[in-house]
């Protein structure tokens, strides 16, 4: 197995442990600076944190960023 594949497999295995970058809660959000805050949670693309409706969610079903 080459190095790239091993790295990707390792990344996939460790992602659930970080809960999609929610590590920012441990130190007030400054772990990776502004980039980290903009990235938000990988799974919800930051919409829920910003309380915005994601584009794929009908406005009538949207409640504070959650569908």
UniProtKB/Swiss-Prot annotation:
Residues annotated as signal peptide: 1-20
Superkingdom of origin: Eukaryota
Maturation propeptide residues: 21-48
Key word tRNA-binding present: no
PTM entry text: Contains 2 disulfide bonds.
Tissue note: Expressed by the venom duct.
Keywords: Cleavage on pair of basic residues, Disulfide bond, Neurotoxin, Secreted, Signal, Toxin
GO molecular function: toxin activity
Localisation per UniProt entry: Secreted
GO CC field: extracellular region
Family: Belongs to the conotoxin L superfamily.
Domain comment (free text): The cysteine framework is XIV (C-C-C-C).
The protein's name: Conotoxin Cl14c
């Amino acid at each position: 197995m080459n190095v790239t594949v091993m790295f990707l497999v390792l990344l996939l295995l460790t992602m659930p442990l970080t809960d999609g970058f929610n590590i920012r809660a441990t130190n007030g959000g400054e772990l990776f600076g502004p980039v980290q805050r903009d990235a938000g949670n990988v799974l919800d693309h930051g919409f829920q944190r910003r309380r915005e409706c994601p584009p794929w969610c009908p406005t009538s079903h949207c409640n504070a960023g959650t569908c």
